[in-house]
Amino acid sequence: YGLTPGIEMTTGPLGQGFASAIGFAYGERFQRGLLDPETPKEDSPFYHKIWAICGEGDIEEGISGEAASLAANQKLGNLTVIFDANRIQIEGDTNLVLAEDVLKRFQAYGWYTDEFSFIQPDGSYKEDIEGLADVIAKAEKAAPDQPKLIKVHSLIAWPTPGKTNDPSSHGSKLGTEAVAGLKEALGYDPEENFHVDEEALAHARKVAERGLEAHKEWDEKFDAWRKANPDKAALYDRLKAGELPEGFDKALDDLEATFEVGKGVATRGASGSVLNAIAAVMPELWGGSADLGGSNKTDLK
């Protein structure tokens, strides 16, 4: 974040990215409710879906469990997580440390779950993207109001000779010899570096063209929204500019005038008063504290 255009945040520890994806899904719904609440979601320029890819390491972390519970409780149907389950960690098979049935755990949270395997019944391996797309489409149709977890059984480092499905592929580089073997297995010259297929290049250019067309369609939808909603458009412009609303300072000054000099007030009570004073002029203010609002005064009236 801050170095590359288009990146909105950089995550660190395992599980943080999983929780962040849920935050993005939650944020989409909040933003749409703030700026375009009356429009059917599919027709709103602010509606979009969140796609995330995670591995066993993310699933093992406690933060992902807490965030997953929140996502189900809030019915974040705009979120789909692809769970790459290759059963490999640095020390060997993930069964050494991950014993539970992950899909059943997520079902218990309230998620829609399904699975798909690139490992074929005869033991061969095929990364069947079309088949996976069908499973995702089925999930989208079956569970529009639930977050979705699709478990994909895969092989790490396939088809690298001597490295496929091997724990050493998880935490260290493949090495020159293994990379040469991978190139050969994929039909490339093992001695050639930094090569991009014409077919891959053409595909990437088509993706860019498709993106430009989608962007044009979105711009038209957004412009129509701006013309139809001048007040909301003004709010959008202020939010994008990162500016405070009119009346912000006055709201705090008015609140300060209500406090009696020399009369004690609990810090949490003062904090709650400030939050509600700001919320009256700042509709984008959003927060909470699990189930402790009545105690720590974070609930907005």
In which residue ranges do the predicted regions lie?
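Glycine-rich ThDP/TPP pyrophosphate-binding loop and its adjacent helix/strand module
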Residues: L3, I7-K206
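Active-site neighborhoods and metal-handling regions in enzymes and metal-associated proteins
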Residues: R210
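Thiamine diphosphate
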Residues: Y1-W51, E213-K301
